[in-house]
Amino acid sequence: MAKAIAKALLEIEAVSLSPNDPFTWSSGIKSPIYCDNRVTLGYPEVRQHIRDGLCDLIETYFGDVEIVSGTATAGIPHAAYVSEKLALPMNYVRSKSKSHGKQNQIEGALSKGKKVVVIEDLISTGGSSITAVEALREAGADVIGVVAIFTYGLKKADEQFKQAQMPLYTLSNYNELIDVAKENGEISDNDIRSLVDWRDNLS
């Protein structure tokens, strides 16, 4: 599964590698990799594969889930696909409360007293996922885990999830992506060293 997802993300250019001409993230970080899983929405077969994989993770590790929750905004469509297949209620969590109306941070199914799994598209530092987890907990939810499409495998993310005592499972990861890119002849051994060094030094 991890290899197939990595291959698909590379093929549709949801993930791009550029060791010699780094991308600039919105945070200002210079990175040899850029991941935009929103691209998957334009590829029905890929998004169905992702949906089925996320469902498998949830059924394997969080079989007693009662609500699926997506992180705004990129996690929302995948949460919708998963909740539809599993026939479960869904909500989504904003990064902060609205400034108008009822000022809700969580929209959709009520979480209080319910076992909830959070769906995220991408794990970088883990900040957005943990923000969603904390908001759901404040609303009285029993958040039992997070599942995501892809992770960079940064130590900061590992530390955040550990501190929050929150299990995390992903469909694919940085190491798998590098392996697939090498098999495809897209990167050299020097590129691999550069990619690994970036991840380890950023951590």
Curated annotation (Swiss-Prot):
**Keyword Methyltransferase found:** no
**By its UniProt entry, which PROSITE patterns does this protein fall under?**
PUR_PYR_PR_TRANSFER (PS00103)
The coding gene here is pyrE
The protein's role, per its UniProt record = Catalyzes the transfer of a ribosyl phosphate group from 5-phosphoribose 1-diphosphate to orotate, leading to the formation of orotidine monophosphate (OMP).
Amino-acid positions noted as binding 5-phospho-alpha-D-ribose 1-diphosphate in the UniProt annotation, renumbered to this chain: 94, 98, 100, 120-128
For the keyword Oxidoreductase, the answer is no
Q: Kindly state the subunit structure of this protein.
A: Homodimer.
Q: Which taxonomic lineage is given here?
A: Bacteria, Bacillati, Bacillota, Bacilli, Bacillales
The record's family statement is: Belongs to the purine/pyrimidine phosphoribosyltransferase family. PyrE subfamily.
| A Pfam family it matches | Pribosyltran
Q: Which cofactor does it need?
A: Mg(2+)
- Residue spans crossing the bilayer: none
Q: Which reaction does this chain catalyze?
A: orotidine 5'-phosphate + diphosphate = orotate + 5-phospho-alpha-D-ribose 1-diphosphate
Query: Which protein are we looking at?
Result: Orotate phosphoribosyltransferase
Q: Which InterPro entries match?
A: OPRT, Or_phspho_trans_dom, PRibTrfase_dom, PRTase-like
> Which EC class does it fall in?
transferase
Positions with a binding annotation for orotate:
124
Its pathway is: Pyrimidine metabolism; UMP biosynthesis via de novo pathway; UMP from orotate: step 1/2
User: What EC identifiers does the entry list?
Assistant: 2.4.2.10
Cite the GO molecular-function annotations of the record.
Answer: magnesium ion binding; orotate phosphoribosyltransferase activity
Going by the UniProt record, its keywords in alphabetical order are: Glycosyltransferase, Magnesium, Pyrimidine biosynthesis, Transferase
Q: Which GO terms describe its biological process?
A: 'de novo' UMP biosynthetic process; pyrimidine nucleobase biosynthetic process
